Amino acid sequence: MLRAGAPTAGSFRTEEVHTGTTIMAVEFDGGVVVGSDSRVSAGTAVVNRVFDKLSPLHQRIFCALSGSAADAQAIADMAAYQLELHGLELEEPPLVLAAANVVKNISYKYREDLLAHLIVAGWDQREGGQVYGTMGGMLIRQPFTIGGSGSSYIYGYVDAAYKPGMTPEECRRFTTNAITLAMNRDGSSGGVIYLVTITAAGVDHRVILGDELPKFYDE
């Protein structure tokens, strides 16, 4: 006889894997910086400590993933496929706005089935660096945006610390500080920080390891 509270066959179902996360993107004159933490969890268990949540959509367009890991990656893969075809038809790289619209349309079409929030950011010859939020099928261009479970802890910081006209290095420092603060407070965010800087010259990838993260007074 089963005891009360004893595990049953049904209780061993695999929980959905989530990128309970902190993602961020910032525009600067000539490009963008996109960043994320690296923790992936299923329920209370951490299933991946170093997952890269910055997914390329095209050569100079990336998206930052949050929500269900499978759903977010599915949206990114569908968008990347459509943008590849779009680029072949136009015989030139797609615009960042076009990429954001593709992600927005997919997110809205499957809003009842998929649990994901993507930030789209990149560079093109027409508008330079651009950052778009696509939550729930909306589309908003912003000088910077944040997302994921950790974002609720850093709205005050990013509003106070952001200033127009920052250099690429200042944007990287701003992004690193914000994500570090979120990782300190949000149990679903953690690991390392991935940074991608996108300009006309190309894409620069960086990883900020745990012992390289900035230190704050509350630690």
UniProtKB/Swiss-Prot annotation:
The modification N6-acetyllysine is found at residues 53, 109. The active site is at residue 21. Detected in liver (at protein level). Expressed at high levels in the thymus, spleen, lung, heart and liver. Expressed at moderate levels in the kidney. GO terms for cellular component: cytosol; nucleoplasm; proteasome core complex; proteasome core complex, beta-subunit complex; spermatoproteasome complex. Autocleaved. The resulting N-terminal Thr residue of the mature subunit is responsible for the nucleophile proteolytic activity. CDD domains: proteasome_beta_type_6. The record marks 20-21 as: Cleavage. Keywords: Acetylation, Cytoplasm, Hydrolase, Immunity, Nucleus, Protease, Proteasome, Threonine protease, Zymogen. One of its GO terms (molecular function) is threonine-type endopeptidase activity. PROSITE patterns: PROTEASOME_BETA_1, PROTEASOME_BETA_2. One of its GO terms (biological process) is antigen processing and presentation. Its EC number is 3.4.25.1. The keyword Protease applies. Residues 1-20 form a propeptide. It catalyses: Cleavage of peptide bonds with very broad specificity. Pfam families: Proteasome. Disruption phenotype: Depletion of LMP2 by RNAi suppresses expression and activities of the matrix metalloproteinase MMP2 and MMP9 by blocking the transfer of active NF-kappa-B heterodimers into the nucleus. It is found in: Cytoplasm; Nucleus. The proteasome is a multicatalytic proteinase complex which is characterized by its ability to cleave peptides with Arg, Phe, Tyr, Leu, and Glu adjacent to the leaving group at neutral or slightly basic pH. The proteasome has an ATP-dependent proteolytic activity. This subunit is involved in antigen processing to generate class I binding peptides. Contributes to NFKBIA degradation and subsequently NFKB1 generation. Belongs to the peptidase T1B family. This is Proteasome subunit beta type-9. It comes from Mus musculus (Mouse). The gene is Psmb9.
